[in-house]
Amino acid sequence: MSLDVIVGLQRGDEGKGRFVDLLAGEYAIIARGNGGANAGHTVIPKGAREPLALHQIPSGIAYPDKLNVIGNGVYLDPPQLSGEIEAVRSAGLPVSAKNLLISSAAHLVLPHHILLDSLRESGQQAQGSTKSGIAYVAADKYLREGIRLEAIFEPSSLLLERVADGLRTVNELLPANRRQSKAEITKAADAWLRSTEQLKTYVADTVEVINDKLRAGERVLAEGAQAFWLDIDHGMYPAVTSSSTTVSGLLDGLGVSAKHLGKVVGVTKAVKSHVGGGPLVTEVTDQKLADRIRGPLGKTDSEYGVTTNRPRRIGYPDLVELRNAVLINGVDELAISKLDHVPRYGPTVSVATSYNYRGKQRRTAPASAIALAGCEPNYKELETWDKELSEVRDYADLPAKAVEFVEFFETELGVPVTRIGVGPRREQVILKPSK
């Protein structure tokens, strides 16, 4: 059978988790194959009133009878993951080796990786990272000096020494007033090691597990972390993440051949946003307008980072960047979230249809932060609508201007829209009939 994929087409925070949550019931396995604790997503379990914030556990955990897999391409943070498992259980959902497996080949985020990340972000080389240590665990991976999850089965004294040694090395780089004592280093390393104990029960050869299911005719849903424009190769380098966020990267991070690839669903928000540094060509510069679009901190569907609570920068809808993402990911269907937020822009909304760059007009975006900073958007104005959409469930009940907005995306991107989000809850999704 096939492996279907859901990927973000913008810069993260598109609402992928809620569409995975919606579709998960149709699949035997829900898997994550990239990203790490720096990639947050939220789901609202059936019957729950409060959202569940996840980072490393797949969104399918909201379905107790589904197997969730964390693949070899994920950068795993053991203390954070252990806490996440407890949070899921506190929400009334079971977690065991029956519904969660983790690749033995996943690389581990160590305490000194996070320390290095924090140190860099406090200096002049800050890039607006989530301080999750991802860049540094990735560096160790490609230097072939990393520690994989399989190492937690080594004698604990050996692993403890490796972790402590990393802390000691970084400790020497710190200013005198921030250095840790030997006792503090030992304590930090020991706490990290203890967090790996409960993970042992979930460790498996997930490549074998997933491929066995596919050969048996089962369906697998791969959930992409972050989004296209944060991809290490095709994104706005260097304001990117440290892994591939494309469909091909996700397949590699799960150990699945491209011959199993089925449907690719690309998720985009009707409201564009971005957390951290890097250019935002269509950025809303009117701060009062940006605040209105963003919404208040603490509300489920407001524009604040799941991982950091940082306010997201707000932009106008951008079809130029979306064309790159649709092309390289081979997107078959579009899911649009937050259609209900479009009227926050005002009576009309500006939609970027092309850029001017170095005296030429282009319909796709350059994959470079430097080049993007030199682009100017060309907009088409679309009228918004007055009707509240949060209770709409039938496409035929959408106001005409909302339909025009959706169909403008379809025409410009050459891909059908199949699902439309009009609120944060699982049921607040409109299925768009095919033409």
Predicted segment positions?
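Non-transmembrane, aqueous-exposed alpha-helical and coiled segments at domain scale
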Residues: M1-K435
